[in-house]
Design a protein with these regions (language model features):
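Composition- and surface-driven signal marking solvent-exposed, interaction-prone regions
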Residues: 3-7, 17, 141-145
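Conserved short beta-strand edge segments in small beta-sheet-based binding/regulatory domains
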Residues: 16-22
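A generic secondary-structure signal for well-formed alpha-helical elements
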Residues: 8-16, 132-139
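Right-hand nucleic-acid polymerase module
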Residues: 21, 30-183
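Catalytic palm subdomain of template-directed nucleic-acid polymerases
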Residues: 1-13, 47
Length: 183
């Protein structure tokens, strides 16, 4: 490991890059329960196996987007936009590269398909259901959704979208409208 620490800065410099020592650390995979977060995944050694899950920061980003979607709905009562935002977060969709029109599949499954532990999806589903059925408090009291609308949104699930690779279609304009409340 010392060899890496000694040679990495020199190798990076030759590429015109520098090592950010404030964000760099040595990870010991032998320490039980130690977690490495990299590229949206959390790697953890449990027993003799590696546990790969969606990183906590990414889960928090999804929860924040869900909350912001419901906050926007509480203000504008645009059910169709809320439904599109929920579909966007719980499912997958295809983008096309502008220059080649090659498809790029993105979304919950395609962004995290290397995860071996998907328990966090149940946590996301519980969080979503609490938001959906909340009728008290600062946010809940402003969500005036009919029973039919609530029932319509109940069918969306992070676990189902992930395991069944649920794919939705959104136009560019729709994606802009969906994501504008998360900025």
């Amino acid at each position: 490991m010392n060899l890496v620490r000694e040679t990495a800065p020199e190798g990076l410099n030759s590429l015109g890059l520098t090592l950010n020592t404030e964000k760099s650390y040595t990870w010991s995979s032998t320490a039980h329960g130690t977690e490495l977060v990299y590229l949206g995944y959390a790697f953890k050694k449990i027993g003799g196996k590696a546990d790969v899950s969606i990183a906590g920061k990414k889960i928090n980003v999804i929860k924040t987007r869900l909350t912001k979607s419901f906050v926007r709905y509480a203000k504008d009562h645009n059910f169709d936009m809320l439904k599109m935002r929920v579909k966007f977060l719980t499912g997958n969709f295809t983008l096309y590269q502008a220059d080649t029109l090659l498809p790029i599949r993105v979304g919950l499954f395609f962004n995290y398909k290397q995860a071996t532990n998907t328990d966090c999806l149940d946590d996301l589903d519980k969080y979503y259901q609490k938001l959906l059925h909340c009728r008290t408090g600062k946010l809940g009291s402003h969500i005036a959704m009919s029973k039919l609308e609530t029932k319509d949104l109940e069918k969306y699930s992070f676990r189902f979208g992930y395991e069944n690779h649920v794919n939705h279609h959104f136009t560019t304009d729709q994606m802009d409208m969906i994501t504008n409340c998360w900025l």
